[in-house]
């Protein structure tokens, strides 16, 4: 009578644990690769006053900037320029929609450094949004901004770090890995 032990018993609990950990280590980068989609209120710490925007359904793309502006309603309530930031977001891979305010443009006409803001006209009009509603972004590839009314998705690793430009103070920084036009789902 030839009885074979099941593979799990031959390896022992330590070896099984090691195999399981190795499998998780191989799968983890797949999970880590998807950025966490944020909206602008997520950049405001808990306890700060928030007013829920009254969103109406969009019937055409001309209402897109109004929809993004409504998402950013809590920005007007935050103290500037040293508005508190959400420390837990530091180092997270995120995806955030917003409008580009160019700071640096390459010779090829690509914006390589900019502020990402929650609504069109922010930082152009006074006062600018609070620091926790502005992300200072640097991009090696840059983006050709043909229309300042066009919102964009920006993906990258968010850093909780203060920076200052001639237009505004920002509470967050990011090196953009992807930049593409925001479109309604």
Language model: regions and residue ranges:
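N-terminal secretory signal peptides that target proteins for export/translocation
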Residues: 1-11
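Feature of secretome-associated and extracellular-like proteins
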Residues: 1-3, 18, 159, 166
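Compositionally biased, low-complexity repeat tracts
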Residues: 8-10, 29, 152
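Residue-identity detector for glycine
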Residues: 12-14, 98
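Bacterial N-terminal signal peptides
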Residues: 15-27
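OB-fold and OB-like single-stranded nucleic-acid-recognition modules
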Residues: 32-185
């Amino acid at each position: 009578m030839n009885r074979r032990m099941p593979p799990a018993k031959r390896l022992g609990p330590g070896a099984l644990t090691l195999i399981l950990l190795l499998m998780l280590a191989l799968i983890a980068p797949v999970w880590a690769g998807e950025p966490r989609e944020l909206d602008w209120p997520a950049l405001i710490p808990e306890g700060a006053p928030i007013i829920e925007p009254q969103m109406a359904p969009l019937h055409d793309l001309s209402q897109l900037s109004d929809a993004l502006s409504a998402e950013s309603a809590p920005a007007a309530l935050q103290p500037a320029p040293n508005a508190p930031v959400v420390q837990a977001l530091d180092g997270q891979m995120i995806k955030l929609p917003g409008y580009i305010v160019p700071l640096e443009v390459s010779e090829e006409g690509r914006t390589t450094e900019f502020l990402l803001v929650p609504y069109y006209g922010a930082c152009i009009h006074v006062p600018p949004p609070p620091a926790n509603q502005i992300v200072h972004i640097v991009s090696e590839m840059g983006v050709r901004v043909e229309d300042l009314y066009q919102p964009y998705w920006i993906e990258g690793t968010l850093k909780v770090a203060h920076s200052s430009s001639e237009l505004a103070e920002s509470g967050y920084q990011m090196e953009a890995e992807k930049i593409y036009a925001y479109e309604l789902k």
